[in-house]
C-alpha cells in the first residue's frame, strides 16, 4: 500500500482539513462514524482508499491524519462536530495558548513544547502503514501556528523521515485582503525555513478564491466554509489518483517528478474547472474542451498572478469523471494552436495527463453543482514569481522601519533571521527570473562577464 498521512496545522489547516475529510467520506461512502457499508472486506487493507483511511478490527475507517493547533477552539469544533467519531481523540492535538500571529511563538516558544507530541502521534500513524509514501501538510503562511509551527514540524519530519515526500497545501496571503498585519513577516520566514524541506507546495490565496466564489457561484459574501469547500474539491482532485484505482498518475513522487524542474522551483499554480453553481449547470453542457480551456484563464487560478506574463515549465492536467483520452488529446491540441501558451525553450511542450473515472462528488447543500467531469490543472509557471515579489515588497516596507520586529525578537528570534530569510526569497525571485530566460540568452550572458 502507498499510504499518505495528512497533517493539518493551525486554523486554516484544520478548517481546510474538515472540508477535505468531509468530501473524502462522501466520495468513498464512509459515514461520519467511520462505518463503510459498501466495504465488504473488513480489516483487510487492499482497497485504494486505504491510502487515506486505516481500518480497525471493528470495520471503522479512521483518517490517516493529525490536526494540530496551538489553541483549542478550532479543533474543539471538530471534537464536538458531525465527524467527532471519525477521528481518534489522540489525532486532535491542541495547546493551551495560541501563537498570536507570531512566527517566533509558533516556531520557538510555544511550538517546541508540543512538537514532540505531534511527532509521536505521526510515528504511531506511520507504524500502521505498510509503505508510507509521504505527507500532505495543510497550513497558512500568515498565521503564527501555520507559519512557525509548520516550519518546525517540517524540519523535524525531514530528520525522522528523510526520503519521504512532503507536499504542502498553503494559504498564501492575499494581495488586498489581510487577516494580520504581520503576514508578510510570517510568510517570508516560513518560506525560507521550509524551502529546503518541502518537495512541492500548492498555494491558494483567499482573495482569488473569494473572487471565484463571487463570480462563478454568485455568492455575494463568501464565508470560509464556501472557500474551504472549493479548496477541498481541488485537494480531492489532486489526491483522487491516490485514493481510487485510476488510469494515470498514482504516486506523490510523480507530481514532483513532473512538476519540479529544480528543487527550489516547487510552487505550481493550481486551476480548477468547472466552478459552477447548480442553477447554471442545469443549462450548460461542459465538454472536455471547454473545461480544459477555462483552466488557462487567469481568473480561475487559485493565486492572483498572470501566466500570460510568464512561461510554463510544466503542466499537469488531472481529469476526473466521464473523460476519454481522445477528447483530452483534442482539447490539448486545440489549446496549443489557439492559446498563446509560452513554454520555456528548454522544456518541450509536454502536458502530463491523469484521468480518473470517478466523477466529482459534491457536498449536499453546498454551492457547487454536481458535474459529470472536472479538471484540475497544476502548472509550474514563472508567473508565480509575481506573488513572491508582491510579498517581498510588503515585507520591505515594514522591515525598513523595523515595525513589529520586537515581538519576534522577544520570543527568542534574532533580527538576522529576518534579513537571511529576505535574502533567500530575493534569491528565489532571481531563480524564477533565470529559469524563464531562453537557454541561448543565459549562456550568451555568462560569456560576456569574463
Curated annotation (Swiss-Prot):
Annotated GO MF terms: GTP binding; hydrolase activity; metal ion binding; structural constituent of cytoskeleton
Binding site for Mg(2+): 71
EC number: 3.6.5.-
Active-site residues, as the UniProt record annotates them: 254
SUPFAM superfamilies: Tubulin C-terminal domain-like, Tubulin nucleotide-binding domain-like
Cofactor(s) the protein needs: Mg(2+)
Catalytic activity: GTP + H2O = GDP + phosphate + H(+)
Gene3D superfamilies tied to this protein: Helix hairpin bin, Tubulin/FtsZ, C-terminal domain, Tubulin/FtsZ, GTPase domain
GO cellular component: cytoplasm; microtubule
Modified residues (N6-acetyllysine): 40
Localisation per UniProt entry: Cytoplasm, Cytoskeleton
Gene Ontology terms describing biological process: microtubule-based process
Positions with a binding annotation for GTP: 11, 71, 140, 144-145, 179, 206, 228
InterPro entries on file: Alpha_tubulin, Tub_FtsZ_C, Tubulin, Tubulin/FtsZ-like_C, Tubulin/FtsZ_2-layer-sand-dom, Tubulin/FtsZ_GTPase_sf, Tubulin_C, Tubulin_CS
Post-translational modification remark: Acetylation of alpha chains at Lys-40 stabilizes microtubules and affects affinity and processivity of microtubule motors. This modification has a role in multiple cellular functions, ranging from cell motility, cell cycle progression or cell differentiation to intracellular trafficking and signaling.
Record bears the keyword Ubl conjugation: no
Keywords: Acetylation, Allergen, Cytoplasm, Cytoskeleton, GTP-binding, Hydrolase, Magnesium, Metal-binding, Microtubule, Nucleotide-binding
Signal peptide location: none
Function statement: Tubulin is the major constituent of microtubules, a cylinder consisting of laterally associated linear protofilaments composed of alpha- and beta-tubulin heterodimers. Microtubules grow by the addition of GTP-tubulin dimers to the microtubule end, where a stabilizing cap forms. Below the cap, tubulin dimers are in GDP-bound state, owing to GTPase activity of alpha-tubulin.
Quaternary structure, from the entry: Dimer of alpha and beta chains. A typical microtubule is a hollow water-filled tube with an outer diameter of 25 nm and an inner diameter of 15 nM. Alpha-beta heterodimers associate head-to-tail to form protofilaments running lengthwise along the microtubule wall with the beta-tubulin subunit facing the microtubule plus end conferring a structural polarity. Microtubules usually have 13 protofilaments but different protofilament numbers can be found in some organisms and specialized cells.
Protein name: Tubulin alpha chain
Organism: Tyrophagus putrescentiae (Mold mite)
